[in-house]
């Protein structure tokens, strides 16, 4: 049975669009095609999830949006301008995976956040009052102002994630790419990060979140991209997260269980419950569709040092 492919119709770049990827193909020097026929459009004021198995092209797509890879075909527009123009204006920020950072490098929290201001400084890279003010505001927003003089390697996993979010805020970026922001953090920290992303969405920013944590995606992502060297499905998360689409994207990687109610009174929303799990955070499908969990109480307090 062919999966229920959900792909948004082609959209021409215009005001209000954050990231537009049109018919993109990326090939490496060895001839390997890492990504092909990739098309989607994410409007401003949106949180979108990028979901797929390891090696499916997520990192390639991020690198293409950041301008690190030459496109063999197609184009990428960011905020109705070329990637190069968006980068020159410091409009794209990247929050890396934890394993991509050398936590032993001796640098203070405030210095990491100040790196987000480099594009706003002159040739000598001397921070001005506006740069210090931006760093202060960013640290306060992620509740880490009291840890600014700490070595970043001394922080907890969740605090480290929030430092790089603060760097993106100090940069004054409008598009933020987050690579596995919930890996190695507890539920409380995950909720804090999600709350911040939701606030940024209200400000009209665009966030593309690469994650393996399927269970949390329906809670905060407006749209979802399923990727496997091409775009398998793109659209509203509730429409993309179907059993057929997930089996095509994750077949053989995630365990899948279906619970079918035998009760004649279960013809409603709980007649069929599917579970996709990798033992981290299961994704629950009710009658074949993903649903967000009830919102938990918001807690803006930071982790203990």
Region spans (language model):
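Conserved ABC ATPase signature
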Residues: 151-155, 159
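Catalytic Walker B motif of ABC-type/P-loop ATPase nucleotide-binding domains
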Residues: 176-180
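ABC ATPase nucleotide-binding domains
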Residues: 243-244, 248-305
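A short, flexible loop at the N-terminus of ABC-type nucleotide-binding domains that lies
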Residues: 2-4, 8-21, 25-37, 44
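Helix-to-loop junction immediately C-terminal to a conserved catalytic motif
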Residues: 66
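Conserved ABC ATPase "signature" region
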Residues: 114, 129-147
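Conserved ABC transporter NBD signature motif
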Residues: 74-85, 92
């Amino acid at each position: 049975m062919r999966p229920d492919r959900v792909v948004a119709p082609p959209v021409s770049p215009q005001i209000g669009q954050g990231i537009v990827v049109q018919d993109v193909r990326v090939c490496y020097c060895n001839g390997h095609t890492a990504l092909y026929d990739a098309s989607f459009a994410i409007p401003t004021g949106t949180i979108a999830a990028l979901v797929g198995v390891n090696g499916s092209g997520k990192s390639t797509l991020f690198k293409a949006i950041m301008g690190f890879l030459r496109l063999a075909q197609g184009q990428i527009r960011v905020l109705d301008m070329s990637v190069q123009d968006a980068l020159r204006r410091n409009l794209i920020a990247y929050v890396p995976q934890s394993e991509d950072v050398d936590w032993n490098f001796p640098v203070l929290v405030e210095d990491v956040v100040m790196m987000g201001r480099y594009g706003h400084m002159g040739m000598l890279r001397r921070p001005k009052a506006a740069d210090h003010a931006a760093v202060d505001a960013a640290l306060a927003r992620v509740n880490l102002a009291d840890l600014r003089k700490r070595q970043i390697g001394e922080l907890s996993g969740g605090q480290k994630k929030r430092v790089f979010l603060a760097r993106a805020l100090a940069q004054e970026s409008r598009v933020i790419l987050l690579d596995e922001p919930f890996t190695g953090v507890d539920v409380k920290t995950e909720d804090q990060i999600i709350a911040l992303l939701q606030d940024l969405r209200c400000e009209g920013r665009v966030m593309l979140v690469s994650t393996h944590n399927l269970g949390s995606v329906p809670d905060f992502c407006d749209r979802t991209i399923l990727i496997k060297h091409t775009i398998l499905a793109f659209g509203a998360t509730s429409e993309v997260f179907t059993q057929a689409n997930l089996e095509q994207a994750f077949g053989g990687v995630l365990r899948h269980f279906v619970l079918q109610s035998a009760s004649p009174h279960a013809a409603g929303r709980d007649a069929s419950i599917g579970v996709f799990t990798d033992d981290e955070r299961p994704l629950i499908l009710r009658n074949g569709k993903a649903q967000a969990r009830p919102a938990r109480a918001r807690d803006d307090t930071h982790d203990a040092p």
